[in-house]
């Protein structure tokens, strides 16, 4: 038991170590990081606190890492909160008043903030002021409290759920996109060096191309391949070993996992290729709607295997080809949702 706790603690330390320390270490997202570096440098050169930043995109692509990089670049503290925990003004009050000048206030899943808490944040973002109600009943009064200038960094997987007033208060907004296989291989090379893993370039590329364009997943798979090689291959990691290790996880050569394939084959086998509504699909696959929409669908759509129409989800001819299925019953709908 002590050994297991030690291993978990060690892996947690590596999780932190794998996070890039600055924009120069952040591999991929070249246009985004170039704009962000210019934005931050210009503010610092003027002696100002940088404006508020919003990062949006699928999970696991580095939005949290970018928040840490912003704080490190500014050279101040980082205060972290999660949107679902911020429901009412009192949830924000202590966090906002604790901020020092130049601190970065990071809200993950900012689209899940409560509406009342979100509106309370507006004046804090725009004027660095908040109103506090003193007492209650007929004698209640409101006083305005000045806040130290700070930079808010928001991260969301669903930018469309942000209200326009909140979105408009961000000076910088950037989409974090899926990574190329080449960028992921570079990230894995850095990670393998930090973790002390001896893997050749072909093995790292094999892991990269099955990682769904997602660094977080790539690093997790790298650890799995390490464990597999340790127990089955005498710590030797080449492309063949990587392929065997990933096949054991039921990850195919396109990066599709068991749930991806179940989703596609369910539409093919039970709904003649679609269209099928997301609620029905959620029940059939056994995954909640949010997980399907945030985790699985974006990658399948990116790979051209799935499309969304006004009538529901449909598989594409490419999906039939990849799964080696007959597409005689495939319907053709051009209307996109």
Swiss-Prot record:
Pfam families: AAA_lid_4, RuvB_C, RuvB_N. InterPro entries: AAA+_ATPase, AAA_lid_4, DNA_helicase_Holl-junc_RuvB, P-loop_NTPase, RuvB-like_N, RuvB_C, WH-like_DNA-bd_sf, WH_DNA-bd_sf. Its main location: cytoplasm. DNA binds at residues 308, 313. SUPFAM superfamilies: P-loop containing nucleoside triphosphate hydrolases, Winged helix' DNA-binding domain. It is found in: Cytoplasm. GO terms for molecular function: ATP binding; ATP hydrolysis activity; four-way junction DNA binding; four-way junction helicase activity. Its EC number is 3.6.4.-. ATP binds at residues 18-19, 60, 63-65, 126-128, 169, 179, 216. It comes from the Bacteria. It catalyses: ATP + H2O = ADP + phosphate + H(+). Residues 253-337 are annotated as: Head domain (RuvB-H). Keywords: ATP-binding, Cytoplasm, DNA damage, DNA recombination, DNA repair, DNA-binding, Hydrolase, Nucleotide-binding. Belongs to the RuvB family. Has 3 domains, the large (RuvB-L) and small ATPase (RuvB-S) domains and the C-terminal head (RuvB-H) domain. The head domain binds DNA, while the ATPase domains jointly bind ATP, ADP or are empty depending on the state of the subunit in the translocation cycle. During a single DNA translocation step the structure of each domain remains the same, but their relative positions change. NCBIfam families: PRK00080.1, ruvB. HAMAP family: DNA_HJ_migration_RuvB. This is Holliday junction branch migration complex subunit RuvB. It comes from Chlamydia felis (strain Fe/C-56).
């Amino acid at each position: 038991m002590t050994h297991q706790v030690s291993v978990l603690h060690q892996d947690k330390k590596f999780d932190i170590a794998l996070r890039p320390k600055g924009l120069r270490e952040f591999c991929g997202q070249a246009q985004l990081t170039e704009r962000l570096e210019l934005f931050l440098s210009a503010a610092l050169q003027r002696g100002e606190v940088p404006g508020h930043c919003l990062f949006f995109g699928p999970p696991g692509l580095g939005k949290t890492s970018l928040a840490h990089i912003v704080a490190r670049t500014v050279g101040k503290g980082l205060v972290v909160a999660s949107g679902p925990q911020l429901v009412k003004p009192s949830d924000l009050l202590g966090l906002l008043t604790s901020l020092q000048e130049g601190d970065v206030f990071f809200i993950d899943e900012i689209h899940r903030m409560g509406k009342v808490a979100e509106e309370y944040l507006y004046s804090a973002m725009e004027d660095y002021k908040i109103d506090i109600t003193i007492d209650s009943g007929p004698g209640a009064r409101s006083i305005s409290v000045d806040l130290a200038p700070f930079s808010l960094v928001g991260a969301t997987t669903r930018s469309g759920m942000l209200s326009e007033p909140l979105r408009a208060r961000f000076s910088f907004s950037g989409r974090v996109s899926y990574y190329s296989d080449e960028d992921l291989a570079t990230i894995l090379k850095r990670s393998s060096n930090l973790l002390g893993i001896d893997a050749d370039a072909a093995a790292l590329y094999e892991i990269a191309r099955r990682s769904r364009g997602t660094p977080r997943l790539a690093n997790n798979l790298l650890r799995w391949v390490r464990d597999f090689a340790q127990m089955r291959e005498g710590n030797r990691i080449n492309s063949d070993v990587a392929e065997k290790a990933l096949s054991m996880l039921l990850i195919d050569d396109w990066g599709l996992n068991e749930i991806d394939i179940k989703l596609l084959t369910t539409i093919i086998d039970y709904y003649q290729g679609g269209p099928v509504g997301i609620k029905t699909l959620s029940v059939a696959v056994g995954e909640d709607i949010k997980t399907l929409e945030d985790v699985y669908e974006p990658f399948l759509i990116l790979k051209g295997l799935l499309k969304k129409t006004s009538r529901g989800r449909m598989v594409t001819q490419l999906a039939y080809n990849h799964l080696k299925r007959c597409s005689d019953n495939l319907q053709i709908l051009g209307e996109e949702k």
